[in-house]
Structure formats: C-alpha cells, structure tokens
Design a protein with these regions (language model features):
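The catalytic Tyr-centered alpha-helix of NAD(P)H-dependent dehydrogenases
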Residues: 57, 68-75, 98, 106, ...
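Conserved catalytic-core motifs of eukaryotic protein kinase domains, centered on the activation segment
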Residues: 11-19, 54-58, 106-107
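Glycine-rich NAD(P)-binding loop of the Rossmann-fold in SDR/ketoreductase-type enzymes
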Residues: 15, 19-30, 66, 70, ...
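C-terminal substrate-binding subdomain of Rossmann-fold SDR/epimerase-dehydratase oxidoreductases
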Residues: 124-125, 129-181
C-alpha cells in the first residue's frame, strides 16, 4: 500500500488544522493498521522534508532532529510516527521524506517553489525570491517515481525513514537556475 493522500502544503494545513491532522496523521495510521491486519506486507508513507522546518545553515539527514513548528510538518511527523511503530518482521513500513517536488505534469501544482518561479518567469517575465539563503531539498517528479518504485522493490526486511530528494539548493540558487532557463 502506498499512502499518497493528505493535505499537501503549509497554507492548506493552516487553513484547516483539524482536517490537516485527520488527513496527514490519523488516516495513514489507521490505513497502515488495517493494511497490516489484512496481511499486506509493506506500507509506504509519503512524508515530507518539512518535518525539519526551515533552515539557512544546515543540511539534514534522517538522524537530524525534527524541529518543525508548522502544522503541516508536525502532521507529517505524526503520520510517520503512526505508521512506523507498526513495522515488524512481517510488515515493512517505509516513510519517504520527500523534498519539494517539481517538474511537468498534467495537473501542475503552482504552489511549489520551482513551478511557481517558472510560471512567474513565463507569465510576468520576472522571478521574485524571498529569503534567498533558505535551503530547499528539490525532488524532480521522475526521481519521486523512482523512489516509490525502489521502495516497492526493496527487500521485505527493509523498514525505515528515508530522505529523498534530487538535490539541495538555496532559494537564490533556484531563482538563478530558473532565470537562466
């Protein structure tokens, strides 16, 4: 089972904190519990690198402290906790802490930093970068698909939390790259 559902960003989480908690924390915990009860061998949870909060000075790995104080990141961490405690030798649980996804799709999301910059460059001829020194893990949609496929194909005894991103950039670097395109 791959859980891709839930509230997808900070503004939506802040708009409806209770719905955010239900969709990002309670639902994956319940679905993973029912999956295990039904004999499913693996549960994959689409988490987020937002669990680390925002940083100017550091890059994070899976052992880094989770310091998010925003409802979205908190709910994704609660979702991880809700699914990970079910892992055992008969039920593998993988949580993928995804970077900010970017890339072309049939249903473009223009609330994502790279996609927003491209849209603004194309429609307004300019890119605005606030806080250019903030680091963001960026995750191309093709790399995201590969991460989920590899999670499906992983040996049965693999469980854990994994950061997945294509690369790390500052918002200023992203603006420069988009501007050069």
């Amino acid at each position: 089972v791959i859980f891709l559902g839930g509230v997808s960003n900070d503004p939506m989480a802040e708009f409806s904190p209770s719905e955010n908690f239900i969709q990002n924390a309670a639902c994956p915990a319940y679905l993973s519990y029912e999956s295990k009860r039904a004999g499913v061998r693996r549960f994959i949870y689409a988490s987020s690198c937002s669990v680390y909060g925002y940083t100017v000075d550091e890059l994070y790995d899976e052992k880094s402290p989770t310091t998010c104080s925003y409802p979205y990141g908190i709910s994704k961490l609660q979702g991880e906790n809700g699914v990970m405690h079910l892992a055992d030798d008969k039920f593998s649980v993988i949580a993928l802490r995804q970077g900010t996804v970017c890339g072309h799709s049939d249903r473009m999301r223009f609330d994502l930093v790279v996609n927003t910059m491209f849209k603004n460059a194309m429609t307004h001829g300019e890119i605005t970068v606030n806080n250019p020194s903030i680091w963001r893990p960026i995750f191309h949609i093709q790399d995201a698909c590969s991460a989920f496929i590899r999670s499906i194909q992983a040996p049965d005894n693999i469980s854990g939390v994994f950061n997945v991103a294509s690369d790390n950039y500052t918002l200023g670097q992203i603006g420069d790259i988009v501007g050069a395109e």
